[in-house]
Amino acid sequence: MEFPLAQICPQGSHEAPIPTFSTFQITDMTRRSCQNLGYTAASPQAPEAASNTGNAERAEEVPGEGSLFLQAETRAWFQKTQAHWLLQHGAAPAWFHGFITRREAERLLEPKPQGCYLVRFSESAVTFVLTYRSRTCCRHFLLAQLRDGRHVVLGEDSAHARLQDLLLHYTAHPLSPYGETLTEPLARQTPEPAGLSLRTEESNFGSKSQDPNPQYSPIIKQGQAPVPMQKEGAGEKEPSQLLRPKPPIPAKPQLPPEVYTIPVPRHRPAPRPKPSNPIYNEPDEPIAFYAMGRGSPGEAPSNIYVEVEDEGLPATLGHPVLRKSWSRPVPGGQNTGGSQLHSENSVIGQGPPLPHQPPPAWRHTLPHNLSRQVLQDRGQAWLPLGPPQ
């Protein structure tokens, strides 16, 4: 008000302290007082410019460095919390002047009679300011809003649901500590309050109340002409940029149906031909244990010498006859260490040469001139190592 908050007398007391300022100065005690009273008005960022009661015309309010930022906050606060009840059919009351400075408000009220008033936005806090013409100067009162939404003059007890009701109350009840009342409002000369676009504010508030869901950009199908989008309530405003459809995606080349129906033959390796002559044949009779090889067959030895007794000679010779037998290389035989096995038996007696008998068709890997029966009966086979003599 017109004195520091530290000089506010206890509520219920009508003793007025000596005024020292034409408008009260915001201090830390003011913030504590607002918290104790439950006010929701924002704390001021810069104090109202002070002036002496006798030199009101010399007071000049210098906006702080954050004035543009403060105006943006005030505009957002007004749109969210005050516009729905203050605006009537999209029009603001005549006594609300919006963003006008303290100096301009004093210039407008200077020629007016005592008690003439107006309401404006504060230059130091996010709230309203009541400015009226007193007997000697113009006085400025900050208006606060309680947690329940009621409006009060900062430092007063009377709280009201609407700002219009608060102004009407002080036309009949004086404002302490000076005992001055309000008489008539000062109507503004502009159709809208300064710094506010009521059409935009009302349309934004209406769109948010009707459609609380977030807005999404429409999807335009290919082949359809884009429809110009206009903002709700914009009226004569030009639409912003039109949405451009994306270029069509080139189609893939079509292939003949034969490509999909006829499978491509795959190259498969030819099976290996089976050998005409097998490596070995199954014998008709079992083979003796010492004649059976172990492991995989290696290279065949060049010669194998075996001496056997021949019982088919005539008995007139009187002595056994041994003959030298030369065997052919055995296919698939083993050759241990690359050495050749030779055997030779001395001839006890010489007899007439025996006729050559073809070997029987044996299906085994032993030499053809080896008598299996002799090996089985006598079980004697001398296989000496070393070259033949």
UniProtKB/Swiss-Prot annotation:
Biased composition (Pro residues): 245-256, 352-361
SH2 domain ranges (all copies): 95-186
Biased composition (Polar residues): 203-216, 337-348
Molecular function as annotated in GO: SH3 domain binding
Entry's induction text: Rapidly induced after activation of T-cells. However, the gene continues to be expressed in long-term cultures of activated T-cells.
Residue numbers of Phosphoserine PTMs: S217, S296
Keyword line: Angiogenesis, Cytoplasm, Developmental protein, Differentiation, Phosphoprotein, SH2 domain, SH3-binding
GO biological process: angiogenesis; cell differentiation; signal transduction; T cell proliferation
Subcellular localization: Cytoplasm
Entry function: Could be a T-cell-specific adapter protein involved in the control of T-cell activation. May play a role in the CD4-p56-LCK-dependent signal transduction pathway. Could also play an important role in normal and pathological angiogenesis. Could be an adapter protein that facilitates and regulates interaction of KDR with effector proteins important to endothelial cell survival and proliferation.
Self-association and partners: Interacts with KDR. Interacts with TXK and ITK.
Name recorded for this polypeptide: SH2 domain-containing protein 2A
Species of the source: Homo sapiens (Human)
Taxonomy of the source species: Eukaryota, Metazoa, Chordata, Craniata, Vertebrata
